Curated annotation (Swiss-Prot):
Details of cofactor binding: Binds 1 FMN per subunit.
Signal peptide feature range: none
Subunit description: Homodimer.
Molecular function GO labels: electron transfer activity; FMN binding; oxidoreductase activity, acting on NAD(P)H as acceptor; oxidoreductase activity, acting on NAD(P)H, quinone or similar compound as acceptor
Function noted in UniProt: Quinone reductase that provides resistance to thiol-specific stress caused by electrophilic quinones. Also exhibits azoreductase activity. Catalyzes the reductive cleavage of the azo bond in aromatic azo compounds to the corresponding amines.
InterPro entries given in the database record: Flavodoxin_fold, Flavoprotein-like_sf, FMN-dep_NADH:Q_OxRdtase_AzoR1, NADH:quinone_OxRdtase_FMN_depd
Record protein name field: FMN-dependent NADH:quinone oxidoreductase
Organism, scientific name: Haemophilus influenzae (strain 86-028NP)
Length: 194
């Protein structure tokens, strides 16, 4: 049995293509220890000055201490997972604010990454990530969502990353059905190899 952390970030609830794909992955991974964190239904606080002070490990106020405790909890969930499933829809060419806030809270110096003479080094090595992307249009792999997800995951040490795309969902019901079928086929391939 493996520990799996599922991050949902869509604001569209059950209508979300990435949430539907995440639920499909959860169904395929039954029998594993699965933790689901819905960043839209349980939003994190806005990452502000107090949060920045907290994640640097220098909390002084009650608010900063609470934010550090939240960061610790999120990082513990992530550290416990061998596999990370991330729903990352494209909103205005980038990831949802909720997902960006999550990474702001877990990207902590000397905890999930460190600086070395050769640059930054991620400390969460040996994990797999599957990123579920949904795009209204058609985009190549140079899109900002893919590039951001590769960069931030690599920054914290997760380099075994696979992407599943449901593209063209803005073209209507037939396009959604086709995109979902294609994405589910890709998920089946990935899950079979886990």
């Amino acid at each position: 049995m493996s520990n799996v952390l599922v991050l949902k970030s869509s604001i569209s609830g059950n209508n979300s293509q990435t949430n539907q794909l995440a639920d499909y992955v959860i169904e395929k991974l039954q029998g594993n220890n699965i933790v689901v964190r819905d960043l839209s239904q349980q939003p994190l606080p806005y990452f502000d000055t107090a949060a920045a002070i907290a994640v640097r490990g220098e909390p002084k106020t009650t608010e900063e201490k609470q934010l550090l405790a939240l960061s610790d909890k999120l990082i513990e969930e992530l550290k416990n997972a061998q596999t990370l499933i991330i729903g990352a829809p494209m909103y205005n060419l980038n990831v949802p604010t909720q997902l960006k806030s999550y990474f702001d809270f877990i990207a902590r110096p000397r905890v999930t990454f460190q600086y070395t003479a050769n640059g930054s080094e991620g400390l969460l090595k040996g994990k797999k990530a599957i990123v579920l992307c949904a795009f209204g249009g058609l985009y190549d792999e140079e899109n900002l969502v893919t590039q951001y997800m590769k960069s931030i995951l690599g920054f914290i040490g997760i380099t075994d990353v696979q992407f599943v795309y449901a593209q063209g969902i803005g073209f209507g019901p037939e396009a959604i059905e086709k995109a979902q079928a294609s994405a589910k086929n890709k998920i089946n391939e990935i899950v079979a190899a886990l």
